[in-house]
């Protein structure tokens, strides 16, 4: 038990270290933590020619986004044919390359099923990669409740920081239930609130955040991502409420006028500029 408690403290320490603006962000909304999500599980070059698919493209995009102000990257890797992958070898190779090319950039791996992988495969990925940070959908883990304790216990034991993916208030309620039961461990409190995932046309709006705020703003740390041309408007709204932000081609390819961003770095830079302008 003591070992798990020590590792839980390491998760808290990692959060403090990886959020250089953690304290200031509550005061200065121009500087929330920014996590770039450059590709996702499904989009390809046919969706945008600058969407990174290969290892070299992912590494170059991560470095470019770091250079313009992103603090971390939400990492998806692909098979040779471009399909979504949870292959540990591909993850480890890509993580090493990003660390070499963009030192100081936080790396969060996804465990997204994307209709391809079961919970056992997601758990195996976590064990084999042993990442510093991983995003995990409570909805996906609930497909096999018998493995839920192992998923979160593994992360606690190996020092993997968890960000819970929440698509709606039912997911939030499930997370709270698992926390009360001790399935989700102490210190595993980070949440990503996904706005408009199931909205018509998958178009997010700032008001999509409201259901998550019925009991006030979430306990730190919380982050928001949003789909479609109002992506930056949604993120700016979240920043003013104290949230951190996930931005990139996984969720949005264009600005509010439906003009495509040149690349992920352009979207990150525009968001940062908008945030600074809003508090100027």
Regions found by a protein language model. Give the residues of each.
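A structural motif
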Residues: 67-70, 104, 131, 242-243
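Active-site beta->alpha loop and helix N-cap motifs at the rims of alpha/beta catalytic domains
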Residues: 55-60, 82-145
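Catalytic alpha/beta core domains of metabolic enzymes, predominantly
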Residues: 133-249, 260-266
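Glycine-rich, proline-tolerant flexible connector loops at the mouths of alpha/beta enzymes
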Residues: 46, 71-94, 253-256
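Active-site mouth loops of central-metabolism enzymes
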Residues: 40-57, 110-119, 140-141, 200-201, ...
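N-terminal small/glycine-rich loop or linker at the start of catalytic domains
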Residues: 24-50
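Histidine-centered catalytic micro-motifs
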Residues: 36, 59, 68, 72-82, ...
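Alpha-helix-loop-beta-strand connector modules within alpha/beta enzyme cores
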Residues: 36, 55, 83-110, 154-159, ...
């Amino acid at each position: 038990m003591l070992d798990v408690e020590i590792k839980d403290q390491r998760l808290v320490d990692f959060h403090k270290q990886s959020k250089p603006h953690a304290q200031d962000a509550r005061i200065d909304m121009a500087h929330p933590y920014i996590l770039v999500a450059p590709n996702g599980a499904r989009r390809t070059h046919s969706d945008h020619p600058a969407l990174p698919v290969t290892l070299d493209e992912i590494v170059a995009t991560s470095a470019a986004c770091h250079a313009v102000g992103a603090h971390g990257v939400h990492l998806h890797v692909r098979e040779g044919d471009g399909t979504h992958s949870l292959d540990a070898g591909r993850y480890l190779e890509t993580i090493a390359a990003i660390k070499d090319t963009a030192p100081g950039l936080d790396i969060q791996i996804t465990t997204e099923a994307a209709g391809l992988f079961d919970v056992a495969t997601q758990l195996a990925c976590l064990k084999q990669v042993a990442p510093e940070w991983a995003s995990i959908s409570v909805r996906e883990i609930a497909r096999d409740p018998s493995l839920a304790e192992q998923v979160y216990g593994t992360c606690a034991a190996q020092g993997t920081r968890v960000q819970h993916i929440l698509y709606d208030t039912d997911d939030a309620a499930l997370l709270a239930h698992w926390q009360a039961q001790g399935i989700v461990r102490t210190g595993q409190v980070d949440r990503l609130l996904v706005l408009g995932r199931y909205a018509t046309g998958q178009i997010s709006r700032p008001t999509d955040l409201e259901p998550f705020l019925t009991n006030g703003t979430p306990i730190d740390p919380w982050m928001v991502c949003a789909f479609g041309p109002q992506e930056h408007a949604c993120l700016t709204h979240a920043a003013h409420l104290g949230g951190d932000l996930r931005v990139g081609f996984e969720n949005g390819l264009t600005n509010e006028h439906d003009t495509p961003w040149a690349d992920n770095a352009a979207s990150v830079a525009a968001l940062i500029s908008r945030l600074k302008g809003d508090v100027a």
